[in-house]
Every structure is written in structure tokens, then in C-alpha cells.
């Protein structure tokens, strides 16, 4: 899997690794930059749908990156370029050669080879068709992807335009609202000016700044350091606030100090029409305020003198009031309609530009892509047709091979020719489709380039306008927010005064409220406890009554706790503002604020105080005992007494009686409602009825809450005292909390107001009930304890009950008195409560009516304002729509004019496009030339890379060796350092001065020794070098002499025949190789010796310099590979040893002279010195032995090498002598054989010729006799003479014509024979070269047998040379003999002409023919004997025929006999000529087949043929050896496979002269430049062949 990115500009697909999908888009952009050299700032990545890829997101979050849905890449650098991107035109290597190959194939004869070559050509055409089809499909696919990429960028443009329109609409709406409220803003700014002048006159109270001052001090303590600016600001702010150490100034001092600061303040006049006056007023007030602060500083007053404006300016530095106003006016000036409205018009124009449909939609692109798809479909059909035709070719070839009938070939070749023409037409159609696809892609790229440039510029303009719109929108919003701040600041003086008055009012209220609440809680608690105790006592009495659960239900309920706890604290964080501060502000504030500084008035708390007094009396009455409570206590005491006497079960009867009496008075289940009587005539109740139940029943309506454990007590019959002791106090707490919360609210509930009469009454009577309950709970607790007592304590309890009864009787009397007082108090409270209720009801009604009126007025005003605003908005929208329609009409007119201009521009563009096409064609030609240059450069680079790799490998080997040496030396150094460090001691620094003299002496000795040793080494090295050079010079001279001799021999033989020229060239190459090997060996020896000597001399020089610096003693270390490292080792070792020796000696001397006490140490030092000397001697001996061993090894190696080279040279000399002797012997044997065979052939030919001559003589005699008889019969001789002269003339003409024809035939035969002989010669040469190639490969594989192989090769070459010399000599002798016979024949012909006989030209031309053909025969011994015998026969036949002719000339007297003789001789010669040709061809083919089983092709090379590849120095390239005139060059890509070197990378001496290979691919080429790498003339047609090495074993 791969990640696909499609570059839309050029229509190319870029592939990346799938690991990038997990990474971010920024990483993908970096990968594109590193791989394809596209800068990150020029990359735009878009996916389908128009979404632009964000740099921080991962690539896998986008659903793109496949081959069908790639990521679209746009290169902005290409878009902004003036020229569109050029689509590279790819041409296949074989597509242009097809026509030439078809033409050549059509010219071939109807043979099997033609069928095979045409089948191969058909298959090639099919493969080319497949390549072309796939290439066209790729081009069309790229165009489809370009279309998708354009759609994606258009979707992105649509999104941008939509967001831009939304932003513009938002800005227009906000800006229109701003324009409507601009007058209001100016009015608010004028109000701010007046407010600032008022704030400058209002003093800031000191108590308001104490809390902020403490916070500032805390912040200063928490922060360790502050900048200077912050310190300055804090100092200024602290100067404005009174320090806590300073005593608070009195109001009088403030009154006296503040007028001094306000004397210089002058009232400002605010003009609402102009903003400048507003700004000036604000600034003047600020300056005045600054002047007030300066005046106070000048006066050095220690008082707190800060105005409200000072405090506001300090709060948000540097944003004070002045800067706020200045920013408002700056924003208003920047939002001037004269600036904004043209900009809005420009924005609308950009929206119109973004919606340019002519640029967005590429018209006709879908149709064009559909047509291209149809074209690709037709391309597929053509490929299928080519496939079928190629398969037909293959089938025909197989049939022809199976039939092996040559008669079928003409028809088959004719059909093949027709099919090839069809395939060629299909090929041309495919090329046409390819050209159309490439041009279509180029045109689409050009079209997209223009549109993308438009899109880029439009989006850039939209982005710029969008940024401006965003900035203006922020400016409007900030201005509106500042206007709100201005509005708030304009109300600051009023709010300040109202807040001060409110704080003072609350302080006054808190004081009175706390006093009233404390008294109320105190009395309420007492009243609750009294009621509680009474109910407890009654419960103890009534709990066992029979009537409890049947008649009197609900007597178990308890009153809720009310006003038993103090309310929580509130308004604790209010500033400490007093009434005096308010009076101070009244005296100094200006008149504009005086209405807001009135002293607050509180409600009358007198009725509440009266209620408190009444409640106090009620509590006293509740706590006293009445008659009913007295009876209850009496009954309880009697019950306790009866319990002590009788069983506890008898106690229920009196309680039932007592409860029966009580039930007539109250019923808690249905309490009567509160009846408000007339205050003038209150209902008076008797004193006996003033019990707690009666009070509850007649005066209050409160909810009785049952005890939570009441049902459990009913079932258990026994009373749970713990549950009775629990009172529901949570209700009170919730009530108190509600009270506090309602008190804190801004609009308190009138029902829960503590000042209302209802709440006062409720709280009063709840306190009474709580007091009664507490008293009752106490009584029940006492009773419970007595009931659960033992019988033994009953007597004690009875006595106590008597005492309690007496006390209760006394308390009942007091309670009766209190109840009388309480009755009167309750009557008064009822009157007051009714009056207050009436007043509050009237007030509430009035307030409700006022609120209704005000709400109706405000609602009407709001409704009218909203109607007006809607009307204004609709009118503005109508105006805007009218303007937009006008603008649209103007735009339509402009667009029409622009369309006309665009049509003109399009015409101009068409003309420019035609010019661009011509330029494009020129550019394409240049590009093709560049491609060829690039191919050449790639070949050169390939060869250079191969050489670099070889050098790198050698370098790595050397580095590995050096690393190993370094490791070994480091280990040795570490061992030596470890040994030496153990011997160092602490007194090294003290003994350095005394050792200098000794070091100098030793240094001089060492220097002298070194100089002597260096001179000796130089002399020895020079002697060795001189000896080696002399020996090498001798060897070189001998080899050069040998080579010169060989060259002379080769040059002598090269002039004879064309066959020998090729062989001699190859042999010269062999000798060159031998010379190169010898020279390389000599050069390597010289270089090794020189490098060794140079390294040794450099090492010695470095040793001398290091000895001068470090005082070392290293004389004999000059190893070749380890010299530098061993010098370092010996330097450190010798230095440490010498220093230790000298130091120990000096220590011993000093210790003998000065310290006799340390004798033991002295002895140890001597022992150490001895050990060190022994070690030094051992090390020196080891080093000497190692050095001597190395010298021996070096000398042995040099001697071994010299012995090897001498042995090689001797072997070569011996081999050469053997070769010469063997060649001479072979030559003598060949001469003897040839002479014998020649003699035998001559004898046999003479015999045959004699027989033939006798037969011919017989025939001639018969013809002569016949002619004589005819002559005798003829009537007259004269007539015969005339007839004979005419016949002679006719015969001469015919003979001349036949002579010309015969000469032409002879020339043709000579040409054919020459060609056949050349073929035979080249085949023989190729076989020889194959043998030579095998020898060379064996040389490389077996390095030890190089010299033996060379010697064998030299022997074979010398033998072949001797044989060739013998052949040449024999042929030259035969030629000379034939020439002599020719001269004789010519003399005889001239004699015949003089004697008026017809000459015989055929006889003269025949020897020439055979003389010319004879030297062409091959030079093997087995074949030459047969050929010489044939030649002898021919010569003998010619001699006998000529002799018979000469004899018959004298005998015959008529011309007819002579004509017959000549015709006979001609027929004989023609038959012999044919026979010789057949023998020659059969022998040559048999010799070729006998040489090797696999033939070397020398013409019409096909794939799989074995060829001879030789170095052609004229063309500086490797060529295939051929006899045809066409050149076959070896492809540069095949050089490494054949182990050959290119011309640029190697010299001529180091390049191999020939090699055998197999043809893998062949392509037809033509030279398009005069200067080319093959060095052929312009227009030359040749083949370029790819080959691989041939292995004989395979």
C-alpha cells in the first residue's frame, strides 16, 4: 500500500510510504519537499469536497490518499509562473523504428529466416501496442484526476466565498446599527464629560479604600520582586490612600482640607454637537484633577485628599478616562462612512468576482474526457487486433517449421507482408492516439494554469478583504463595548452618592433591628419554655386517662419553637461610613449630586418597643401559676401518694376526672380563627380563663405540630420522657433563615417583614408558648423520675410533694395577678394590631395602583420605540435594496462591456496560442536533444559510479586493516602504560631541573646515532632501488625487442590478404594485453618499492622531529604499515624509562649526600633501577629482533618476487624458443606435404588431360575429314572464300558479344566468390577468437597459469603465422606461373590474329579467374591439399587444352573447327568452375562445423545469436564483427555485464580487445547529430545491440 498525492499542475501522481498516514500533514509536506523539491510554503493540499488539510491534523483523519481518491497537491510556484507547466513527452525506444523494421522485413526473400524475423517483429509491435495503450490510459486517468482536483479547489473556493459573504453580512448589520446609534453615542460622550467634571469635585472617602489598600500590601508581600514601573504605580496608588499608621482624620479636618483642593476646579461646559468639545472637556477635567493633586503636594497637607476621578483613573492603568474617550473618537473616525462604504462596495465586487461562472466551469471538459475514454476504448480494440495478428504469425511460424516445405513460403510471406502492413497501420493509429492524449493533457494543463492563477489571485484578494472586515468588525464591537463603559461611567456620581446614603441607612437600621430582635428573642424563649412546662405537667396527669384517645384527641401536640434564638449576623462587610461622612459629602459635592445625598429616614420603631413590653408582661403571667395549674399539681401529688400506697393501676381514675373537667374549656383540634375586634371596645375575658390554652384559643391561629413519637407512646401506654423532652426547633431555625434571606433581598416580601404587625404578634405569642412548654417539660421530667422510683423512696417523695404543693399555692396567686396585667396588655395589643392592619392595607392598595400606572406607561413607551425602530429598519432595507438594484444594473452594463473586451482578448489569445504552438515545437526539439544528452550523461555517471564503488570497496578494506592495527597498538599501549604508571612516584617535579644536563648529552648521542643510521639506510635503499630498476630495465628491453620482432612479422604478413589483417589486428591486441600486463606489473613493483621507500623516509623524518621535541631514543622502527603507531609506543616507553632512570639516580645521589637515614629507600631505588635496566635491555632486544625479522621478511619477499619474475621471464623465453622451433618444424612439414600433394595432383591432372586430349583429337580429325569432303564436293572454292570471310566477320561479332557476356558472368562469379571467401574467412576468425576468449577467461579464473596460457597462445599464433606464410608463398608462386602462362597465351593469340584466325579471349580470362580465386582459399593443412590438387588439375587441363589448340591450329585450315574447339574448352572450364565452387563451399562449411558446435553469426544478427564483439578504435566503441556494411554497436548498458569498460572511463591500453556474447535485444538507430558518441556521420543508420556474456559450459 502507498499514499497517493496527485500534483494537479502537471497531472502527475506522487507516491509515498503509508507510514505518513499516521503522521501529521506538516510531516507530509516535509516529505514532499525532500523528495520532489517543492517548498512547503508553495504547497496547498486539498481533499475531495474542497477541505484544505490542516498542518496539525493527522493525514489519516482525512478520507483521501488512495489511487482512486488521492490527495490533491497544488504548487503555487508553478501557478504564479508566467509559463504553464510543460508535460514531458515520452517516446519509447522502438515505436519510431517500426516503419523501418517493416520496410526491411518486406525486402527480405521468402525463406524460413524471413518468417521467423517477421514473427518476432509482429510480437514486438504487439508489445509496443500494449505499452502505448497503457501509457494513453495513464494520460487519460491523469486528466480525470485533474478534473477532480479542479472540482475540489472550486468547492474550496465556494466555501471561502460563503464564509466571506456571511462575514460581510454580519459586518453590514452591525455597522448599520452603529450608524443609527451614532448620535446616541455622541450624547453619551457629552454626558461623560459632565460626569467627569462632577467626579473631579466629589471627594473619595478614606474608609472606602482601606480594604483595597490592605490587599495591595498583601500582594506586595507575596511577590518577591517588582519592576520599576510597577513600584512607581504602587507608590502613586499608596499616596492616594491614607496609610494605616496615620490616625484617622476628623470630619472637621476633611472639611477644612477639601475646599483647598477644589478651589482651582472650574465647571466645564459640555457641547453635545461636537466631539472635540467633549474630548476637551474630559481632558480639562483630568488636568484640573492633576492640578488639585499638585496643590495638595505644594501645601504638604497630611490629609487624605483624593477625588473619585483619581480613583477611577488609577484602577485600570494606562486605560484612564481620557484614553477611553480618545479610543472612542479614533474608532469613530476610522469607521467614517466615507471610508467604509467604498470598502463595502469593493467587497461586493470581490464576491461577484468569486462567482465568475466562466472561470469556474470548464465548458466542454466532460465531453472531451468522454471522447478520450472512447479513444482509449478504440485503443484497446487496436491492441487486441495486434494481439490476434501476432498470434497468427506465431501459428504460421510453427506450421512452417513443422511442414519444412519451401514451396509454402512465398504465399506465407505474401500474407505476412499484408498483415504487417495492417499492423503498421494499427501502430500508426496508436501513435496518433498517443499524440492526441499528450496534446489533450498539455492543453488541459494550460487551461488549468490560467484558471488556477485566477483562483489564486481572487482568493488572495478575498483573504485580504476578509482580514480587513475582521479588523473592522472587532473595531465596531470594541467601540460598542467602550460606549457601554462610557454609559456606566456617566452614572458613577449618582451611584456613588446613592451607595453612600444606602450604607448609612443600613447602618441605622441594623442598630435598631438588633436591639428589637434581642429583646424579642429573650422574651419569646421564656414564653416558650413556660408553655412547654405546663404541657408536660398536664401530659403526665392525663397520659393514663380513659378519655385520652377517645374524646380528647390532639392533647399530645407541641407548639413550634419561635423567636427562641437570635438571628444571624448580616451586613458585616459594609464600609465604615457614618452620618458625619455623609454630611461631609453634602458640604463638598457639587449641586448636581446634592439631591442624591439626603439623610435617610427610618420607620417608627416605637410600636415594636410597646409590643416588646407587652410580651414581657405576658411572659411573667405565663410563668406564674393559675388555679388550673394548681389543681394539676395537686392531682399529681395525690397520684404519687396513691401510687406509694396502692398499685400503680389505680392512678388512672383521678386523671380521667381532671381531664374531663379540662375538656370543656379547649379543643386543640379545631382552634377558633383570629377575630379582630373593634379597638375601642375590646372583648374582656375573666381572669380565670387566662390559661395558656385559653390564650391560644382566643388570640392566636397557629399550627399545632404533633410530637414525632406520639403514636409510639399511645401503643406503649407508658410515656417516653426523652421524646417529650425533644422540641421541634428546626422549624424555628428555618423560619429564622427565611427571615434573614428575605431581609437580604432587594424587594422584601411584605408578609415576612419583621416590622409588620402580623410578624410581631406571631413572634410574641410564640415566645409565650415556648415559655409554657419549657415549664411543662420540667414538671414532666420531675414526675417521670418519681414514677420510676422504688417503693422505699415513696415516703421521701410524699414529703417533698407537700412542700411543692405549698409552693405551688403561693405561685398560683402570683400567676393570677400576672394574668390580670397580661389581659389588659393583650387588649391594647389587639387594638394596635387592628389599626396597623388597616393602615398597611390602604398603603398596599395605593402602591399597587401606582405600579400599574407606571407599568402601563413604560410598556406604551417601549412599544412606540420598537415600532419606530422597525420602521427605520424597513426603510433602511428598502433603500439598500433600491441601491443594490441600481448597482446590479450598473454591473450588468459593465459585464457586457467586459464580455466584448474578453472576446477581443480571446481572439488575441488564439493568435498568441498559435505562436506558442510553434515555440512549443521548437522547445520539444530542444527537449529531445536534452534527453539524448541526459542519456549520455547517465551512461557516464553509471560508469563513474561503478569505479567509485570499486574504490570504496578498496578503501573499506584498507580502513578495516588500519582499524585492526590501531586496536592492536592500543592494546599494547595500554599494557605498557599500565606497567609504567605503577613505577611513577611522588617526587617527579622536584627532580626535573637536575636532569637537564644529562638529557642534553644523551640527546646529542642519540642524534649522532640517528644520523649515521639514516645515512646507512638511505644508502642501502638507494642501492636496492638501483638494482631493481636495472633489472626491470633489462626485462623491459628484452620484452620490447620481442614485441618489436612480433610487430615486424605481423606488419609483413598484413599486406597479403584481408583475412590476415583481421587476425593480425587481434594478435596485436593480444600482444598489447601482454605488454599492458607486463607494464602494470612493472609499474606496481615500482610503485610498491617507491611507496615503501617514501614511507620509510617519512617515518624516519617524523621520528627525528619527535626525538627533537620529546627526547626519545627510537633508532630502528621503520615498519611499513605500523611505523607511526609503533613510534608512538616506543616514544612513550623510552621517555618514561629514561625519566625514571634519571630521577632514581638523582634521588640516590641526593639521598646519599643529604639523607643518610633513608638507606632502605635508597636500596629499593637501586633495585628498581636494576629491574628497569633489565626491562629496557629486554625490550630493546625484543625490538631489535622484531626489526631484524621484519627486514628479513621484507628482503625475502623482494627476492621471492624477483625470482618469480625472473622465472616467468625465463619461462617466456623458453616458450618463445619452443614456439619458434615448433613453427619452423611445422612449416617444413607443411611445405613437404604441399609439394607431395601438388606433384600427385599434377600427375593425375596430366593423365586425365592426356586422355581428354586424345578424345578431342579424334573428334577434331573426324570433323576435319568431314570438312574436306564438303570442300571437295563444293563447285567452286572462290565462293567458299567469300562465304568464309562473311562467316568470319559474323563469328567475330558473335564472339565479341559472347566475350562481353562471359566477362560479366566472370565478374559476378568473382564477386560471389569473394563474398563467400570473406564469409569463410570471418567464420574462421570468429572461431579463432572464441578459442582465444576461452583462453582469456581461463587466465582470469586461474591466476597461477597466466604465463603458461600466454605461452600456449603465442605458440598457436606463431604456427598459424608460419602456415599463412607458406600458403602465401605457394599461392604467389602459382600466381606467377599462371601469369607466365597468360603471357604465353596472349603471344599465341597475337600470332593467331596476325595469321587472320579468330582469337580466344576465353582462354586468357580463365587463368585470371583462377589466379584471383586461388589466394582466397583458407590456410588449414587438411583443406589446402585438396584445393591445391584441384588447382593443379585445372592448370594441367588448361595446359593440355592449349597445347591441343596450338597443334590443331597448324593442322586445321577452317574457322568452324576452331570455333568448335573453343566452345568445348569453354564448357569444360565452366563445369570445372562449378565443381570447384561446390567443393570450396562444402569444405569451408565442414571446417566451420568441425571447429565448434555453436556457430558465430557474422551477418543478420538475431536474438540468441552468438557474436564476436571487438573494440573499434575508429568509433571508440565496441562493435559486432560482421561482413555486412551496416554497423552493429554494443549498448552501453551491456558493458558491465560483459566486464568491459567504456571509452570515457578507461584508456585504450586497459580495454579488452574482444569478447564473445549473446544477443539479447536489437534496436534500429539513426545519427541525428554530427557529433555523437559513436563517431559516425550525420544520418548514418546503424543498430544498437544489447548482449550478455557467453559461457561455453552453459
Curated annotation (Swiss-Prot):
Any idea which GO molecular function terms this record carries?
molecular adaptor activity; protein kinase binding; protein-membrane adaptor activity
Residue window of motif Nuclear localization signal: 566-569
Q: Which UniProt keywords apply?
A: Autophagy, Cell cycle, Coiled coil, Cytoplasm, Lysosome, Nucleus, Phosphoprotein, Transcription, Transcription regulation, Tumor suppressor
Phosphoserine occurs at 222, 229, 237, 243, 253, 257, 261, 266, 624, 647, 650, 652-653, 734, 1091, 1222, 1370, 1484
Q: GO CC terms for this protein?
A: Atg1/ULK1 kinase complex; autophagosome membrane; cytosol; endoplasmic reticulum membrane; lysosome; nuclear membrane; phagophore assembly site; phagophore assembly site membrane
Stretch list, region Disordered: 638-673
At the top level of its lineage, which domain of life is listed? Answer: Eukaryota
State where composition is biased (Low complexity): 641-654
Identify residues that carry Phosphothreonine.
238
Q: How is it modified after translation?
A: Phosphorylation at Ser-734 of the FFAT motif activates interaction with MOSPD2, VAPA and VAPB.
Q: What does this protein do?
A: Involved in autophagy. Regulates early events but also late events of autophagosome formation through direct interaction with Atg16L1. Required for the formation of the autophagosome-like double-membrane structure that surrounds the Salmonella-containing vacuole (SCV) during S.typhimurium infection and subsequent xenophagy. Involved in repair of DNA damage caused by ionizing radiation, which subsequently improves cell survival by decreasing apoptosis. Inhibits PTK2/FAK1 and PTK2B/PYK2 kinase activity, affecting their downstream signaling pathways.
Subunit organization: Part of a complex consisting of ATG13/KIAA0652, ULK1 and RB1CC1. This complex associates with ATG101. Interacts with PTK2/FAK1 and PTK2B/PYK2. Interacts with GABARAP and GABARAPL1. Interacts with ATG16L1; the interaction is required for ULK1 complex-dependent autophagy. Interacts with RNF111, SKI and SMAD7. Interacts with COP1 in the cytoplasm of proliferating cells in response to UV stimulation. Interacts with TP53. Interacts with C9orf72. Interacts with WDR45B. Interacts with ATG13; this interaction is increased in the absence of TMEM39A. Interacts with WIPI2. Interacts with TAX1BP1.
Q: What family does the Swiss-Prot or TrEMBL record give for this protein?
A: Belongs to the ATG17 family.
- Spell out the note in the miscellaneous section: Probably involved in the tumorigenesis of breast cancer. RB1CC1 is frequently mutated in breast cancer and shows characteristics of a classical tumor suppressor gene.
The identity of this protein, by name, is: RB1-inducible coiled-coil protein 1
Q: What is this protein's gene name?
A: RB1CC1
